[in-house]
Amino acid sequence: MPGGTVVDNLTLFRGVWHDVVSGHAPDGSELAFDEHGGTPGALPYEQLVYVDVCDDDGVTRYEQTNVVLRGRDPHARSFGGTVVDGVLQFDRLGPEAPLMLGVSGGPGVLVFTPARVDGPDMGRFFDPDWIRHLGGDQRTRTTTLYRGGEIRRVLTVRGTRISADPTRRVAHDPRGADGPVHDGGRTTTVYSQVSPQEDS
């Protein structure tokens, strides 16, 4: 396994992943529907996740696109960021969205989390991701979701890397095999005071 810097870990996850997403209430009971997420919908579901890390004139850029594969209505969501002083700073996602960071927990461990948790936006929506590389082409992600300052549910994701090339759509991408990879929506209103639930 490579070193444990943020860039090392981002590179470790580069590729196309097939994720199976399940949800649980705080007591561990399995959920059949996620009513609290940015995009409410059925559970479990499956998605393709394209993860790319590239150097742009000496600046390390991160790009990710999630594409629903089955279990929910078709949907694509893209987001990205830039490594600054060794830490991934995500592009702001929309009105009142906090600064999100990608930080390292050591080799094979990434955490996507707000830079600060003391703003009013955190009281409305807060969902840190804990991502772990299991070796080979396997990974897990755990997302805890808080709404109104209260824990609501936990997502558990089990992923298998199906391609090492995130620059091309895989053949079974619901959007079709041709076209740009990172063409999903990039804004969200879940942090806004008036927040229609429309984004994941």
Feature names for model-found ranges:
Residues 2-3, 7-200:
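Soluble ligand-binding/transfer domains with enclosed cavities or grooves
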